[in-house]
Amino acid sequence: ESQKVQGDVIGVDLGTTYSCVA
């Protein structure tokens, strides 16, 4: 679950929907 949260944070940091892609 932490990986999903990290992905969401990375997506927001990059300004992209990285969490959606991942």
Curated annotation (Swiss-Prot):
One of its GO terms (molecular function) is ATP binding. InterPro entries: Heat_shock_70_CS. Keywords: ATP-binding, Mitochondrion, Nucleotide-binding, Stress response. It is found in: Mitochondrion. The keyword Methyltransferase does not apply. GO terms for cellular component: mitochondrion. It comes from the Eukaryota. Belongs to the heat shock protein 70 family. This is Heat shock 70-related protein 1, mitochondrial.
